[in-house]
């Protein structure tokens, strides 16, 4: 095969050098991140791992992953919670939007178009969800979200390198810091991604869900407008109202919920990008912040603008605390509405029984035929969770020390969780409960006719004291109001029939 002994000698020497290099690499103190076990999908390497470096040294990185050494190091240092505590994917995809916008602006300011275009294409893949499997980090990391920002930078860098025919982990020709993170800091990119993610979740999940619930309750209010029932205050009998009026109260609560959430959004639309490390904008160009905000707005269709004050945008998260407060108020409304509906539907024979709720599934593993108000229970649990989330957001928001709040990942995790839960629960509650609610008119009429509080209609005619005596007498004797009134001689039958008319007791005269 070889033409001379000299050629054979050179081949043997090269083979020896390769084997020596392999032994040297194996001898190094490099190890994969604990818990990272991936099915190897060969990308730019024929080995299961590649060697990457950060300022602390070398680490093994799975060859089928686009992230790099800093991401691996984070998985080693923050083994908290496992996969269920990973950074919300909405934040990762928001980062994709931001990194694309930044690359486009940096291109305008002189970044090599080839590099900028590759970054933008890779960022598109992050935003679309194509690269979701390359983001393993948990929420519980540095409070600025630095590890997640670098996770995004590394993934976009390596994917862009691959697109350009380079070697993964080489940082050439696309560097995660110098190019992907150009004119940026974790301190301004993470809060920017927080706001993008929160605004999108509100618009795409929460507000449509609340509107669906609002419309369904409004339809029921119209359907029930002519059904007169007894009201209740302090859980005791009160004067009548229509079932439609009762549901109308729920409609207004949801209407206000939508308005409160929308009212909080202008502050969420303000983006921290361009503030860099402490809000001064060090290492950015004049106009960078405004241009990035404009690009993000164009990419999302939402009215994002650059934050009026970058120091506030980095050091505080009052905008998200405000949004969380609105979500907390929504949860309060949902708790009241769901509780009312399940109590009005209690029974079927030993409860209030004024509403007939849809039967969706068996309710008991021991009591045959039992059906429970499961959608109401799910909604009230969601409401409780959102209230708890707001406590966490409040604590996190109040701990912005000096120039940087370092509770960012926890804050956005809870805000996104609240928005998603309320949006999803509103749709579930609507489709599986509200639209199928029917009025039990027989039960409603029976309870109303037996109520002593109809006596309130007599106040203008015979006075409070005499009306109260009629009610107490009827209760003591077990008689009707009419029987007690006639027995006491305070009015005649014709007067009672004229004055005590539930349909005339539904509003001012």
From Swiss-Prot:
Keyword Lyase on entry: yes
EC number(s) per entry: 4.2.1.2
Pfam families in the record: FumaraseC_C, Lyase_1
Pathway: Carbohydrate metabolism; tricarboxylic acid cycle; (S)-malate from fumarate: step 1/1
Cross-referenced InterPro entries: Fum_hydII, Fumarase/histidase_N, Fumarase_C_C, Fumarate_lyase_CS, Fumarate_lyase_fam, Fumarate_lyase_N, L-Aspartase-like
CDD domains: Fumarase_classII
Gene Ontology MF term list: fumarate hydratase activity
UniProt keyword annotations, A-Z: Chromosome, Cytoplasm, DNA damage, DNA repair, Lyase, Mitochondrion, Nucleus, Transit peptide, Tricarboxylic acid cycle
Example of a GO cellular component annotation carried by this entry: mitochondrion
SUPFAM superfamilies reported for this sequence: L-aspartase-like
Transit peptide, residues from-to: 1-43
An example Gene Ontology biological process: DNA repair
Record: residues binding substrate: 144-146, 175-178, 185-187, 233, 365, 370-372
Active site annotation, chain numbering: 234, 364
UniProt xrefs under Gene3D superfamilies: Fumarase/aspartase (C-terminal domain), Fumarase/aspartase (Central domain), Fumarase/aspartase (N-terminal domain)
Site, as annotated: Important for catalytic activity: 377
Subunit: Homotetramer.
Similarity field: Belongs to the class-II fumarase/aspartase family. Fumarase subfamily.
Misc. comment: There are 2 substrate-binding sites: the catalytic A site, and the non-catalytic B site that may play a role in the transfer of substrate or product between the active site and the solvent. Alternatively, the B site may bind allosteric effectors.
Its biological purpose: Catalyzes the reversible stereospecific interconversion of fumarate to L-malate. Experiments in other species have demonstrated that specific isoforms of this protein act in defined pathways and favor one direction over the other.
Protein name as catalogued: Fumarate hydratase, mitochondrial
Upper classification of the organism: Eukaryota, Metazoa, Chordata, Craniata, Vertebrata
């Amino acid at each position: 095969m070889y033409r001379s002994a000299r050629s054979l000698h050179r081949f043997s020497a090269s083979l020896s050098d390769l084997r020596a290099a392999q032994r040297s690499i194996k001898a190094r103190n490099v190890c994969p991140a604990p818990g990272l076990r991936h099915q190897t999908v060969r990308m730019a390497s024929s080995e299961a791992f590649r060697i990457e470096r950060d300022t602390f040294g070398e680490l093994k990185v799975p060859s089928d992953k686009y992230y790099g050494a800093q991401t691996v190091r984070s998985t080693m240092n923050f083994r908290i919670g496992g996969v269920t505590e990973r950074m919300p994917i909405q934040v990762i995809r928001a980062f994709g939007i931001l990194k694309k916008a930044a690359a486009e602006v940096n291109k305008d300011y002189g970044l090599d178009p080839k590099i900028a275009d590759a970054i933008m294409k890779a960022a598109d893949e992050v935003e679309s969800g194509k690269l979701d499997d390359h983001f393993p980090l948990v929420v519980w990391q540095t409070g600025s979200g630095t590890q997640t920002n670098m996770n995004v930078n590394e993934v976009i860098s390596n994917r862009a390198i691959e697109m350009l025919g380079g070697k993964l982990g080489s940082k050439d020709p696309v560097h995660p810091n110098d190019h992907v993170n150009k004119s940026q800091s974790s301190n301004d990119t993470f809060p920017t991604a927080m706001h993008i993610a929160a605004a999108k979740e509100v618009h795409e999940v929460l507000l449509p869900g609340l509107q669906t619930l609002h419309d369904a309750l409004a339809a029921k209010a119209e359907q029930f407008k002519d059904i007169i029932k007894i009201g209740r205050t302090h859980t005791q009998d009160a004067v009548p109202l229509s079932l439609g009026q009762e549901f109308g109260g729920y409609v207004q609560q949801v209407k206000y919920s939508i308005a409160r959430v929308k009212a909080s959004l202008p502050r969420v639309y303000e983006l921290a990008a361009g503030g860099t490390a402490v809000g001064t904008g060090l290492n950015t160009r004049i106009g960078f912040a405004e241009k990035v905000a404009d690009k993000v707005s164009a990419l999302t269709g939402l009215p994002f603008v650059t934050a009026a004050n970058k120091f506030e945008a980095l050091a505080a998260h009052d905008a998200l605390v405000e949004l969380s407060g609105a979500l907390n108020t929504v949860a309060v409304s949902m708790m009241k509405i769901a509780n009312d509906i399940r109590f009005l539907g209690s029974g079927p024979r030993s409860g209030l029984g004024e509403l007939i709720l849809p039967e969706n599934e068996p309710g008991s593993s021991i009591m045959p035929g039992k059906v429970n108000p499961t959608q109401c229970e799910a909604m009230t649990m969601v409401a409780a969770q959102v209230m708890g989330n707001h406590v966490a957001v409040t604590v996190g928001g109040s701990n912005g020390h000096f120039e940087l709040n370092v509770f960012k990942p926890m804050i956005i995790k809870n805000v996104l969780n609240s928005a998603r839960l309320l949006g999803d629960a509103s749709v579930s509650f609507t489709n599986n409960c509200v639209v199928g609610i029917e009025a039990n008119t027989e039960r409603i009429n029976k309870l109303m006719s037996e109520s002593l509080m109809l006596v309130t209609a007599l106040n203008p005619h015979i006075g409070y004291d005499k009306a109260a005596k009629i009610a107490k007498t009827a209760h003591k004797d077990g008689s009707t109001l009419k029987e007690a009134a006639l027995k006491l001689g305070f009015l005649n039958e014709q007067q009672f029939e004229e004055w005590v008319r539930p349909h005339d007791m539904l509003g001012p005269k």
